[in-house]
Design a protein with these regions (language model features):
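Conserved N-terminal phosphate-binding loop of PLP-dependent enzymes in the Aspartate aminotransferase
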Residues: 1-117
Length: 117
């Protein structure tokens, strides 16, 4: 509509709030998306994903994408293992995390009421 590229930084939110990141929760489809160590369970990795027409610019060497360890084995193995775990049993890990999160939040609310905070 506006002829601009919409980029979404998912370095903090990617894979932490949902397997599809904040973009899934918010119902947004960016043209480009950045992700960080959550995709590899803390192993130093970063990545960029996006729509085919934009990613084709990278694939065709029209855009230089430098990096410290681009595509290194340990990082890529960590990504695959992390994604396997996060998607196991219909993403059950997220349901468990949200259940625990709700208990923690309920406890914090109770404490804040008790001490009039």
């Amino acid at each position: 509509m506006y002829n601009i590229v919409m980029c979404m930084d998912e370095v903090i939110t990617g894979f932490r709030v949902n397997i599809g990141g904040a973009q899934t929760v918010l119902g947004v489809t960016p043209d480009l998306c950045t992700m960080g160590k959550a995709i590899s369970n803390g192993i130093p990795v970063s990545c960029v994903g996006g729509k085919k027409e934009i990613m084709d610019c990278i694939r065709g060497n029209k855009v230089l994408v430098p990096g410290t360890y681009p595509g290194y084995g340990l990082g890529m193995a960590a990504v695959l293992a992390t994604l396997d775990e996060l998607t196991k049993d219909d993403c059950a890990v997220y349901k468990q995390v949200f259940k625990v999160q709700e208990k923690i939040m309920d406890g914090l609310v109770e404490i804040s009421r008790k001490y009039d905070i």
